[in-house]
Amino acid sequence: EKVYTIANVRSRRFPLFDREMEIPTRCKEITKNITETEFEGLCETVAMDELILEKEPIDVVFKYIDLSDPALKREGIAQIKKDEDNEELKYALRSVLTNIPWVRYIFIVMPNDAVRFLKPQEEIAEKIKFIRDRDVLGFDSASSITFEFNFWKLKNFGVSDNFIYMNDDYFIGKPLKKSDFFYVDNGKVVPYMLYNDSVDYKRSAPIFEYLNINPLQLRMNSNEMNKQDQTKENAKAHTSYGFRFQRTSSMIFLYDYFKHDILAPGCRLDYFPHNALGENMRYLKEVYDIVRDNYKYANDTLMANSRKLRSLVHQTAYTFYVLNKYHNRINHLQDCYIDISELWLVVCNADLFCINEGGDKKYSQRMKENAKRKLETLFPIPTKYEL
């Protein structure tokens, strides 16, 4: 007889709270407030949900740039230290193919024509596909944030409705299942996520406590960003690298959120659902279609030409958390360039982690080399798609 957990049959709205509690289906605690018929119906629903999730295609999307490509220098793409290639993508791909092999396709979005350590596109298309920045944005860009505001366009390139988004320095540290990223609510596959905002603080507080996260620090970070916005003529969009900013950014996105009407200029999204979505929950509208007219790439910063875009920068894609069933071990380092020995002590116990080894002057060439050696230790086996 299949054993269901209390998480499967109790609260369909917030299943995270009880996910670790294994309780047999006959347990009186579960059936205390529901009839046997109702409980059997819930078990049938859970079985159906598991089948729905099993059949749901899930893709991985990487944003990548290799600034060693001479073509990009000719095209004038900004040369930024944090975008220097340390072959992180090679190990990120190995981590995905090893630890979440159930993904359907891996899409690499980039301004480059090819990835220098991978075989030609036609030889790897069974699993890995390339998308050019210019095909999504209308122009090539070194900016991940520009691309992230255009996630809704990925459906046009064959990306699954539900997908896992990663920069090229994100890694899957241990084997994970679909159910670690997504679950089914009312027959619809949705990602685990958590919304953080002062408007939603009271509802989020119990979840923060459960996950051992400091919401005050997060709110201070958010307030500081907004304060900076108010004092500058142009809004500065904070690119999230590592888990320093990843606390208030997204690694997992649901395409459906962004598939309807574009927001009118100046609109502010004051409410995001922070966990389950019911069928009657109206879809959130897609964020701005960012093109040259609204944004320009200048040095290491993406600047908005209009104050109208200010609130949008901090109210949309960058207000989610990533959660999975091992949430207490997700790596959220205060600094990505801390002592390398301390860094790897944390990373080796993480299910998801990020190594941004080129984003700051504090990160020396020696540390970059150490990081690469450690990645080679963690993910030593080449994939069949590598040259």
Summary of predicted features, one role per range:
Residues E1-I164, Y170-L387:
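ER/Golgi luminal nucleotide-sugar-dependent glycosyltransferases, focusing on the catalytic module
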